[in-house]
Amino acid sequence: MSIILGIDPGSRVTGYGVVRQVGHKLEYLGSGVIRTSIDDLPTRLKRIYAGITEIITQFNPNEFAIEQVFMAKNPDSALKLGQARGTAIVAAVNQNLPVFEYSPRTIKQTVVGTGAAEKSQVQEMVVRLLQLSDKPQVDAADALAIAITHANSIHNSLQIANSIAIKTPDKITALLRTKYRRGRLRLKG
C-alpha cells in the first residue's frame, strides 16, 4: 500500500491530490488548492511550503510526485513556477519523502491516453478513474492526475522488475535492487 501526494505547482495556486494505492486499485483520499495572496514572492513561497508541510502531516504520504517545469512563453512566469516547484520539493524532502517528477505530456498520456489532452479532459478522466461524485478544481484535478501517473508508474515498474527476476533466477534479488529516478525504473548491478 502506498499513499501518494501529487503536486501541481504554481506561484499563486498550487494544487494537491492524495491517493492510496492498494494493488491495482486507487482510492481518493483528498485534494484541494493552496492559494497565495498577491504578496511578494517570498511570502507566497512561505505559504506554499507551510501548506504542503501541513498536507504531508495530515495525510502521511509515502511518496511525492510533482509536475516538471514546462517552457512558458513568459520567462518571468517560468522562473516563478520554478521557485514554487522548488519550494514544494524542499517541503517534501524535509519530511523525508522520495520525490518523483513527470512531464505534463507524460501525465496527460497516462491519464487521458494522449499527451495533447486539454485540462477539461484530464479533469473528466480523474473523476472517472477515482469514481468521484464531483469534479475537483482544475489545479486539484491536475495534482490528482500526477498522483495517478505515479501510481501507474510504480505498478508498471514493479511488473517489469518481477519479469526480470522471474526470467533470470540467478538475479532473483533484482526486485530488491530496484531504484526509481525521475519516475523511471533503474536496476542496479
UniProtKB/Swiss-Prot annotation:
Residues annotated to bind Mg(2+) 1: D8, D139
Enumerate the active-site residues. D8, E67, D139
Q: Which UniProt keywords apply?
A: Cytoplasm, DNA damage, DNA recombination, DNA repair, DNA-binding, Endonuclease, Hydrolase, Magnesium, Metal-binding, Nuclease
Cofactor annotation comment: Binds 2 Mg(2+) ion per subunit.
Q: Give the EC number(s) under which this enzyme is classified.
A: 3.1.21.10
GO terms, biological process: DNA recombination; DNA repair
Localisation? Cytoplasm
Say which domain of life the source belongs to. Answer: Bacteria
Q: Which reaction does it catalyse?
A: Endonucleolytic cleavage at a junction such as a reciprocal single-stranded crossover between two homologous DNA duplexes (Holliday junction)
List the InterPro entries: RNaseH-like_sf, RNaseH_sf, X-over_junc_endoDNase_Mg_BS, X-over_junc_endoDNase_RuvC
Cofactors required: Mg(2+)
Cellular-component GO terms for this entry: cytoplasm; Holliday junction resolvase complex
Name the predominant localization. Answer: cytoplasm
- Kindly give the HAMAP family that the UniProt entry links to this protein: RuvC
What job does this protein perform? The RuvA-RuvB-RuvC complex processes Holliday junction (HJ) DNA during genetic recombination and DNA repair. Endonuclease that resolves HJ intermediates. Cleaves cruciform DNA by making single-stranded nicks across the HJ at symmetrical positions within the homologous arms, yielding a 5'-phosphate and a 3'-hydroxyl group; requires a central core of homology in the junction. The consensus cleavage sequence is 5'-(A/T)TT(C/G)-3'. Cleavage occurs on the 3'-side of the TT dinucleotide at the point of strand exchange.
The text of the family note is: Belongs to the RuvC family.
How this chain assembles, per its entry, is: Homodimer which binds Holliday junction (HJ) DNA. The HJ becomes 2-fold symmetrical on binding to RuvC with unstacked arms; it has a different conformation from HJ DNA in complex with RuvA. In the full resolvosome a probable DNA-RuvA(4)-RuvB(12)-RuvC(2) complex forms which resolves the HJ.
> What is the protein's given name?
Crossover junction endodeoxyribonuclease RuvC
Q: What organism does this protein naturally occur in?
A: Histophilus somni (strain 129Pt) (Haemophilus somnus)
